[in-house]
């Protein structure tokens, strides 16, 4: 179960920074589409555990590594695993894992990124030994201190957002959509660096239109898959308040109220909007 706040849906409809619960919804919807369309050789990992605020303890990091290891082993015939990673509630980087090649490529949309990837690097690296132990194959194994690890490329070429923009998550979804689209049409080449360099040459007007398409797709997912009883993501029961509170705690989203009431009895739904020029 995912608990979505109306505040966050309101943010999405106004192209404000996206909360990670919405990215999880989008990712699960895309993965179902990949399965339905039989898009070859690619998996989107459920990003439930891939959030810095959830990875605070060694035990939590081990749970995340074990989960990722299980996903990779369950899809041993696949080469490409897409992992949305959240350094905080609204800042997201897409990581493309290729376990057989021991490669982890970070599609970081910041032009001068200062993100600390230490924690997620350890989580990813700790998933590889189990993959190797239980029959995972490598075409290019990398070992450090006798242990299988990834080569982490945190400066991989990708579309960059303008200075001051807070739309990391939209860019992560743009990269996700591009990878899945080209993989579906079998245009994703083995030379991923060359492919990504060509992708990064997108024009400003095109990226603006892409953000609007992502916004529209969010609306379609909610309207077609979440709300109707026939939807693939419809929850066929009414959760109790305690179940909602438990889910909020599990998804590390229990540190804020649903809505903040202003003195004039209105509601604060979203932050001050960014300049319309910052996409």
Question: Where would I find each of the regions flagged by the language model?
Answer:
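A structural/positional concept
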Residues: 2-35
